Amino acid sequence: MHEQYTPRDIEAAAQKFWDEQQSFAVTEQPGKDTYYCLSMFPYPSGKLHMGHVRNYTIGDVIARYQRMLGKNVLQPMGWDAFGMPAENAAMKNNVAPAKWTYENIDYMKTQLKSLGLAIDWAREVTTCKPDYYRWEQWLFTRLFEKGIIYRKNGTVNWDPADQTVLANEQVIDGRGWRSGALIEKREIPMYYFRITDYADELLESLDELPGWPEQVKTMQRNWIGKSRGMEVQFPYDQASIGHEGTLKVFTTRPDTLMGATYVAVAAEHPLATQAAQGNPALQAFIDECKSGSVAEADMATQEKKGMATSLLVEHPLTGEKLPVWVANYVLMHYGDGAVMAVPAHDERDFEFAHKYNLPVKAVVRTSAGDEVGSEWQAAYGEHGQLINSAEFDGLDFAGAFDAIEAALIRKELGKSRTQFRLRDWGISRQRYWGCPIPIIHCPSCGDVPVPEDQLPVTLPENVVPDGAGSPLARMPEFYECSCPKCGAAAKRETDTMDTFVESSWYFARYASPNYDKGLVDPKAANHWLPVDQYIGGIEHAILHLLYARFFHKLMRDEGLVTSNEPFKNLLTQGMVVAETYYRVASNGGKDWFNPADVEIERDAKAKIIGARLKTDGLPVEIGGTEKMSKSKNNGVDPQSMIEAYGADTCRLFMMFASPPDMSLEWSDSGVEGASRFLRRVWRLAQAHVSQGLPGKLDVAALDDAQKVIRRAIHAAIKQASTDVGQFHKFNTAIAQVMTVMNVLEKAPQATEQDRALLQEGLEAVTLLLAPITPHISHALWQHLGHAGSVIDAAWPSVDEQALVQDSITLVVQVNGKLRGQVEMPAAASREEVEAAARSNENVLRFIDGLTIRKVIVVPGKLVNIVAN
């Protein structure tokens, strides 16, 4: 065994061994417990960042631990390879997105391998390869024929300069992020998934996921947004509108119907269009609304604006005439593009009514009283007893809901209805680097799905996009085709799918990645699914995790899988954060400096009190800790860390510095500490092995001092097993190993028994560290005399006998202050413990002359004598 710990050699040797032995290749083994551990696959951006390293290290530790429990563990990896960044990089570097993507995958795969991850690389999937996305297209055609996918016009952000659709986040202050052109709202035909058909099931089956964080389930519940409310119809005032009809609104507060003082409609509403005829000012306002953001979040925060029309509708219960306004806060796609406004009990309506001097009528008695003041109070939105509501006065919310519904039903002007906030999922993207939508547009047959024997519709890979619209739409060789039904000249769809589609089913493809008769081999899929442990960032709580759950149900309904949910347990790992440093630039912006380029000064408590740039020695501002990012220039390159310290040190630091679901603060001194600890383990093992391996430990012959050491070893195994197995608290499990190391380093090595005990201790340390630092554990296990590999070793088991104590030490307090200690047999009775405490020499000094009122005994811990 080499005297020095040399991570580079040790890690290369372990990785070579795993490769040659195909240690992580996995097959279905009926009868053996399976465990499917999956970390969210990365986008091949070019190189790994610390967030990736943390995510994959956590997954790997769990996978390796489960393998040590004797399970058949699947841990695959792949690449979420379609998407905008490849197009942007392609334009910047004048290179085809395919070339850029495949080169990035090659480099990042090497990086992942250097971390020593226990991945079955034979199952690798790459979503931009035709053998992957052909099955996505196959499923699309099935769902299109079933009507679960349909085509309709959707409102999008249109960049007139680039002739392309922009995502909400690509619109900055109303302009295109690349062209700077003013963005228009435009209606274009798009494909949609009917995810709303599954809204109830997606909501209800969240209750079948006890292994998910409550926070994520709450976010999904809110996103689906089920609300019971009422559909209310306001009859048109024929004198002003000119024809019969009703304005339909949806409200979750029908109890406030008697307080409605106006109605507001979206800019796209037919009444808005009618009112704008011959009213240029209103038409200009409608155009302004239409060019605004289509994002709901922006709608909520933007200034509420409106314009009156000359139109009126009638209150369904009182017949009172209410004015129709056009307002920018009403969404055409929520409810029916119109709202009844109750300014006394809705904050948005209140702001609007005050701005435009519209009447406010209180109809609910709240904790703020019966009146509504000139400033909004949260209490105005409360449920309460009805007032100023004619025959409904005195009813509470539930009573009013039922009574008002009955009144509306009698007049055929309303009924209760369940509404969802969730919208159908629009998946059409006017982009090049995505999965082609397998539809052919025929002048006589309409939209025809591409037949199965013509799949995949392959994306041409030698294209360099220029940013102006979709390149596919300018490639006749791609879109010119004949109709599969009638044979006439037809046009292929040139839109590609939202890249969230690929990541909605990849977890199932890993079960049979090379299966060529379908999307999955149902036998293999049902053997492995659902995923036992899924690991990824909280930022995917809604979209990705909701779409994956939806897709799993689609696959179930196609007979491909039998389970209802894709991921049994979910761990959302915290961010990796680091210090930030900057100087204010001449233009008022900030120039950020990487922590590696900054010399820092700390106070006695290790708090940073000053910082200077190494190059010029001048001060820089301290910006506090933030998520590692390019924009703040506070990232640490994992590759440089692995090269400097080895993968095991990086893994140990990552797992020790914080629990997996909390933020991890990067610290160079913490990495140093992890490296020092592994060197200590190596040094102790090397000194031990160099003396020759000892014989078997004779547990029955241990003296008291040896029993204490063995108790420490087994107490650590017990605690670490609980921490890792039940709570994923790897940081506290590592702390247990460190405690044992402190004991072992001080342990005597004089006799054969001493050395046999040290052997047991070092084996326990090696096994407890094996999932976390697999390379050093691989080497130590061999040097400690084992023929097999540590990856095939079992997790250490606790010898409960070792934990039994013959005697225990209790502290003795007088009136809560420590005054002595007594050593007692572990089986001593309460009376014996109390007698020993009272007769302790030091304790006697403090109770002399006092009356003992009571004696509190906490078994195994302490005795407190209360005296005065």
From Swiss-Prot:
<dbReference type="GO" id="GO:0004823">
    <property type="term" value="F:leucine-tRNA ligase activity"/>
</dbReference>
<dbReference type="GO" id="GO:0005829">
    <property type="term" value="C:cytosol"/>
</dbReference>
<dbReference type="InterPro" id="IPR013155">
    <property type="entry name" value="M/V/L/I-tRNA-synth_anticd-bd"/>
</dbReference>
<dbReference type="Pfam" id="PF09334">
    <property type="entry name" value="tRNA-synt_1g"/>
</dbReference>
<dbReference type="GO" id="GO:0002161">
    <property type="term" value="F:aminoacyl-tRNA deacylase activity"/>
</dbReference>
<dbReference type="InterPro" id="IPR002300">
    <property type="entry name" value="aa-tRNA-synth_Ia"/>
</dbReference>
<dbReference type="Pfam" id="PF13603">
    <property type="entry name" value="tRNA-synt_1_2"/>
</dbReference>
<dbReference type="InterPro" id="IPR025709">
    <property type="entry name" value="Leu_tRNA-synth_edit"/>
</dbReference>
<dbReference type="InterPro" id="IPR009080">
    <property type="entry name" value="tRNAsynth_Ia_anticodon-bd"/>
</dbReference>
<dbReference type="InterPro" id="IPR015413">
    <property type="entry name" value="Methionyl/Leucyl_tRNA_Synth"/>
</dbReference>
<keyword id="KW-0547">Nucleotide-binding</keyword>
<comment type="similarity">
    <text>Belongs to the class-I aminoacyl-tRNA synthetase family.</text>
</comment>
<protein>
    <recommendedName>
        <fullName>Leucine--tRNA ligase</fullName>
        <ecNumber>6.1.1.4</ecNumber>
    </recommendedName>
</protein>
<dbReference type="InterPro" id="IPR001412">
    <property type="entry name" value="aa-tRNA-synth_I_CS"/>
</dbReference>
<feature type="binding site">
    <location>
        <position position="630"/>
    </location>
    <ligand>
        <name>ATP</name>
    </ligand>
</feature>
<keyword id="KW-0963">Cytoplasm</keyword>
<dbReference type="InterPro" id="IPR002302">
    <property type="entry name" value="Leu-tRNA-ligase"/>
</dbReference>
<dbReference type="GO" id="GO:0006429">
    <property type="term" value="P:leucyl-tRNA aminoacylation"/>
</dbReference>
<dbReference type="GO" id="GO:0005524">
    <property type="term" value="F:ATP binding"/>
</dbReference>
<keyword id="KW-0030">Aminoacyl-tRNA synthetase</keyword>
<keyword id="KW-0648">Protein biosynthesis</keyword>
<dbReference type="InterPro" id="IPR014729">
    <property type="entry name" value="Rossmann-like_a/b/a_fold"/>
</dbReference>
<keyword id="KW-0436">Ligase</keyword>
<dbReference type="InterPro" id="IPR009008">
    <property type="entry name" value="Val/Leu/Ile-tRNA-synth_edit"/>
</dbReference>
<feature type="short sequence motif" description="'HIGH' region">
    <location>
        <begin position="42"/>
        <end position="52"/>
    </location>
</feature>
<dbReference type="Pfam" id="PF00133">
    <property type="entry name" value="tRNA-synt_1"/>
</dbReference>
<keyword id="KW-0067">ATP-binding</keyword>
<dbReference type="Pfam" id="PF08264">
    <property type="entry name" value="Anticodon_1"/>
</dbReference>
<feature type="short sequence motif" description="'KMSKS' region">
    <location>
        <begin position="627"/>
        <end position="631"/>
    </location>
</feature>
